[in-house]
């Protein structure tokens, strides 16, 4: 049963009303702070490429009105009576999920991101039937279990994208054992995901090669992000020279691209981990996998324990996303630029200073 409006908090944000993807101001309600809930004032929210897919219903399950945003950071304004981890004034964040069953094998293993009953931060339904709205809004209410603490030395705007892009790349580096000093890891694509993958891998002591279709990104990869080497994936001579040299590859690309050349870069027992989500199936040649016991795997965000671990690791190593901070009324232009990959490397909305809240 939906909660009555008089028992909800008024909220203001920006929403898409249909698959045109155009966003505009939208007033709505969030639930009151429950006994295990944390309410916080949203200060910044990153724009993820999945937000673009969702506002345009490109994955086919969007519902409208849709308030996007799952890279949400801010300051706690209220806590429930049974909240133990947070207090008013704490710097906090919410990523891609705001609920799970908390009892299945995945949940008990701190893998809420793989719970069959996970609740996405926006465009989903809470167990009471109410709609989840994301971080393009002035306030957020969530169970404390799905909230992470942002250390004081991390700037909130640069930390916001870590709640999606950061954990999406950190988790496979850890899980697939590609975090050992001296290992050689490739990162395919130098965008919102790829640039933080390079930063995390380098902080772990890993040798990093960036693999890109664009020769223009070489200087950025080597001099700014600190990668050890750079491969132009369309340069057959470069790719041939690197065959069999990598322990693993994190593939962040969401566009159509061939996997065979990437598999060739792996050494025996090497792992190609897909974290991008192309709209159409990719062709997977099996024979090259057999000839080196190679693996192609996938990874999606991370559980709450690991997300906090990732944020703490980022704080220790001064890792933030490279961002362009925008006012919220620039949102539709930012979405158009995102389609063209015209951002270095993540848009972050300055919610706290630019969102006009309804009276």
From Swiss-Prot:
InterPro entries, per database record: ADH-like_C, ADH-like_N, ADH_Zn_CS, CAD-like, GroES-like_sf, NAD(P)-bd_dom_sf, PKS_ER
Keyword presence, RNA-binding = no
Query: Record-annotated residues binding Zn(2+) 1?
Result: 48, 70, 164
The source's domain of life comes to: Eukaryota
The keyword Membrane is annotated on this UniProt entry: no
Keywords in alphabetical order: Metal-binding, NAD, Oxidoreductase, Zinc
The catalysed reaction is: D-mannitol + NAD(+) = D-mannose + NADH + H(+)
Note on cofactor: Binds 2 Zn(2+) ions per subunit.
Which one Pfam family would you cite for this protein? ADH_zinc_N
Mind telling me which SUPFAM superfamilies this protein's record contains?
GroES-like, NAD(P)-binding Rossmann-fold domains
What does the record give under GO molecular function? mannitol dehydrogenase activity; zinc ion binding
- GO biological process: what's one of them? lignin biosynthetic process
The cofactors named for this UniProt entry are:
Zn(2+)
Instruction: Name the EC number(s).
Output: 1.1.1.255
Q: Which residues bind Zn(2+) 2?
A: 101, 104, 107, 115
UniProt cross-references to Gene3D superfamilies, sorted A to Z:
Medium-chain alcohol dehydrogenases, catalytic domain, NAD(P)-binding Rossmann-like Domain
Sequence similarity: Belongs to the zinc-containing alcohol dehydrogenase family.
Q: What does this protein do?
A: Oxidizes mannitol to mannose. Provides the initial step by which translocated mannitol is committed to central metabolism and, by regulating mannitol pool size, is important in regulating salt tolerance at the cellular level.
Q: What is this protein called?
A: Probable mannitol dehydrogenase
Give the source species.
Fragaria ananassa
What gene name does this entry carry?
Answer: CAD
């Amino acid at each position: 049963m939906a909660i009555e409006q008089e028992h909800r908090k008024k909220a203001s944000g920006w929403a898409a009303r249909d698959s045109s993807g155009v966003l505009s101001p939208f007033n709505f309600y969030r639930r009151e702070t429950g006994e295990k809930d944390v309410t916080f004032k949203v200060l910044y929210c990153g724009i993820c490429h999945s937000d673009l897919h969702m506002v345009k219903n490109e994955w086919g399950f969007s519902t409208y009105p849709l308030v996007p945003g799952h890279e949400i950071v801010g300051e706690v304004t209220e806590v429930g009576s049974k909240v133990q981890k947070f207090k008013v004034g704490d710097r906090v964040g919410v990523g891609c999920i705001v609920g799970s069953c908390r009892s299945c094998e995945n949940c008990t293993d701190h893998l809420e991101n793989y719970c069959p009953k996970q609740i996405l931060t926006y465009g989903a339904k809470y167990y009471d039937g109410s709609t989840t709205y994301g971080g393009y809004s002035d306030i957020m209410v969530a169970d404390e279990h799905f909230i992470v603490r942002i250390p004081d030395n991390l700037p909130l705007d640069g930390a916001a994208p870590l709640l999606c892009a950061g954990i999406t790349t950190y988790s496979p580096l850890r899980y697939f054992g590609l975090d050992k000093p001296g290992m050689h890891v490739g990162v395919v694509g130098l965008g919102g995901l790829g640039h933080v993958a390079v930063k995390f891998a380098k902080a772990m002591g890993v040798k990093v090669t960036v693999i890109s279709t664009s020769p223009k990104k070489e200087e950025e990869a080597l001099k700014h992000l600190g990668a050890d080497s750079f491969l132009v994936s369309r340069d057959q001579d470069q790719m041939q020279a690197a065959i069999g040299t990598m322990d693993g590859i994190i593939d962040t690309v969401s566009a159509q691209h061939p996997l065979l050349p990437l598999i060739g870069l792996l050494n025996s027992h090497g792992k190609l981990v897909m974290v991008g989500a192309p709209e159409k199936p990719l062709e997977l040649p099996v024979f090259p996998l057999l000839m080196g016991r190679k693996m192609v795997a996938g990874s999606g965000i991370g559980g709450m324990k690991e997300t906090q671990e990732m944020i703490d690791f980022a704080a220790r190593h001064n890792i933030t996303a490279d961002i362009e901070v925008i006012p919220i009324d620039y949102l539709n232009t930012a979405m158009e630029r995102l389609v063209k990959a015209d951002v270095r490397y993540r848009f972050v909305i300055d919610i706290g200073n630019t969102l006009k809240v309804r009276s």
